[in-house]
Design a protein with these regions (language model features):
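Juxtamembrane transmembrane-helix termini
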Residues: 2, 7-9, 60-90, 95-120, ...
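Functionally critical transmembrane alpha-helices in membrane proteins and complexes, commonly lining
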Residues: 18-76, 93-95, 301-306
Length: 395
C-alpha cells in the first residue's frame, strides 16, 4: 500500500489507522488467554503453560499493558488533565464496582448455600458482602472471599483473582497524567523515551532497588509492569517519525523474542516498545469481525471470567477435563461481559465523551495523524490488565 499525503513526514511506513484495526480482537484474545491460564490453578491442575520466563496469563498482561500504554498516552496528550482523568475513571471504576456487587450479591450466596445448605449467617459472617465491596472500592484488592466462600474448590477463598491488577493499571494512568503536565514531554519524544529506559533499568536492577522500598510488593509489581505500559507510550510519541511497516515490525518481534529468551527475568519489560510496535502492525492486517470492532467486551471477559470459573468449580465441572471446563467457562463469561458492555460501559463512555471536549493546553507531539479525534483512542481503550501469575492469595 502506498503512503497517503499525511505520511510525508514519516521516516518509514505509514500512519497507524486508529479506526480500522483489530485491537479489540487482540484484547479479547488476551482476555481469553487469561481465562485459559486460570483454568489450571482453579481446577487444581499443575504445570500451566509457560514460556520465556512467564505464564500464558503473564504474557497476556504484557500485551494488555503495551496496547494500553499507546492508547492511553494518546488520550492524555489530546485531552486536558481533567477530561483525561474523568475518562479513565469512567472507563475503569463503574464496571469494577458493579462486578464487586455482582460477586457479593449473586455469586457468593450461591457458594454459601452450596457449602452450608442455606443462607443463615451469610450477612453476619466474618467477611460480609458489604465488607467485600467496601474494602475493594479503591481498586486495591484487600479482601478476596465473601463469608468464607468459595469453599471446597481447588483454589478456595478467592472469588476474583483478576481484579488486583487493575490497581496497577490505574497507577500507570496516573503516571502518564503527571508526566503529561510538562510541555517538554508533549513537544519531544525523548523525555518519555528516557523515562521508559529508566523504568527498564529499575526492573533490571530490582534486587538493588527493592530494599529502598523495603521489598514492598506493590512497588515491585509496578516496577515490573511499568516498562510494558511505557513501551506502548514510546511507540506513540515516535509515531510522527516511525510509521507502521512490516520490516521493523518483524525485527521488533524478533528482538522481543530474543530478549525474553536470553534474559527471562527482565527481557519482557525491556521489549515493551518492540512488543507494542509488533502488535500495532498485527492489528492492521489481522481481520476482525465488524461486531468486535464496534463492541469491546474484553474488559467484561476479564473481570467476570474468574468468578464464573470458580462457580463452575463449585459444581465440579473442572473434573470433566480442562477442555470442557475452559470452553463452558468462556461461553458463560460472555453473558455478564456483554451485559456489562451494553448496559454500563458503553453508555457511560458515550455520556463522558458528550460532556468532555476540552483539548490539551499544550500541543502534543505533532505528527501526520495528529488530526485523529481523541475519541478514537477512547473507543479502543480498555483499562484492563488481566492478571498473570502468581495468583493472589486470600488476605
Amino acid at each position: 500500500m502506498g503512503k497517503s499525503p499525511a505520511d510525508g513526514g514519516l521516516w518509514v511506513g505509514k500512519s497507524f489507522d486508529s479506526r480500522n484495526n483489530s485491537l479489540n480482537l487482540i484484547r479479547l484474545i488476551f482476555a481469553l488467554a487469561v481465562l485459559v491460564h486460570h483454568a489450571w490453578p482453579l481446577s487444581g491442575t499443575e504445570n500451566s503453560p509457560a514460556f520465556a520466563g512467564d505464564t500464558l496469563g503473564g504474557w497476556a498482561v504484557a500485551g494488555f499493558f503495551v496496547i494500553s500504554g499507546y492508547l492511553i498516552t494518546h488520550s492524555r496528550f489530546t485531552h486536558s488533565l481533567g477530561d483525561y482523568l474523568v475518562h479513565r475513571v469512567a472507563r475503569i471504576v463503574p464496571a469494577f464496582v458493579i462486578c464487586l456487587i455482582v460477586v457479593a450479591g449473586m455469586f457468593a450466596p450461591v457458594g454459601y448455600v452450596k457449602a452450608n445448605g442455606s443462607l443463615d449467617g451469610f450477612l453476619g459472617a466474618a467477611t460480609t458482602p458489604f465488607n467485600y465491596v467496601f474494602s475493594n472500592l479503591g481498586l486495591r484488592m484487600s479482601v478476596y472471599d465473601v463469608a468464607g466462600t468459595p469453599a471446597a474448590v481447588p483454589y478456595a477463598g478467592v472469588w476474583n483473582g483478576s481484579l488486583w491488577s487493575i490497581y496497577f493499571e490505574f497507577c500507570c494512568y496516573l503516571i502518564v497524567a503527571f508526566i503529561g503536565l510538562f510541555a517538554l514531554v508533549r513537544k519531544s519524544p525523548w523525555p518519555l523515551t528516557i523515562f521508559f529506559l529508566l523504568s527498564v533499568a529499575a526492573n533490571v536492577f530490582m534486587v538493588r532497588v527493592s530494599p529502598y522500598a523495603q521489598a514492598n510488593y506493590e512497588f515491585e509489581m509496578l516496577v515490573h509492569l511499568l516498562p510494558f505500559f511505557l513501551g506502548g507510550a514510546v511507540v506513540y510519541v515516535w509515531k510522527h517519525r516511525i510509521g507502521i511497516h512490516w520490516l521493523p515490525a518483524i525485527l521488533s518481534l524478533a528482538a522481543a523474542a530474543a530478549l525474553t529468551a536470553f534474559f527471562p527475568a527482565w527481557g519482557g519489560g525491556a521489549s515493551g516498545a518492540f512488543i507494542a510496535y509488533g502488535l500495532l502492525w498485527i492489528s492492521l492486517w489481522l481481520p476482525s469481525p465488524r461486531l468486535i470492532k464496534k463492541n469491546d467486551v474484553s474488559y467484561g471477559i476479564y473481570i467476570y471470567a474468574f468468578p464464573v470459573q470458580q462457580l463452575l468449580a463449585l459444581y465440579g465441572l473442572h473434573e470433566h477435563g480442562l477442555t470442557a471446563y475452559i470452553c463452558i467457562a468462556a461461553v458463560l463469561t460472555f453473558i455478564p461481559a456483554v451485559a456489562s458492555w451494553i448496559l454500563l460501559e458503553r453508555p457511560i463512555m458515550r455520556a463522558v465523551r458528550r460532556t468532555g471536549k476540552t483539548p490539551a493546553t499544550v500541543p502534543a507531539v505533532a505528527g501526520p495523524d495528529a488530526g485523529v479525534p481523541a475519541q478514537a483512542a477512547d473507543s479502543n481503550v480498555v483499562g484492563v490488565t488481566p492478571d498473570g501469575s502468581p495468583l493472589p492469595a486470600p488476605n
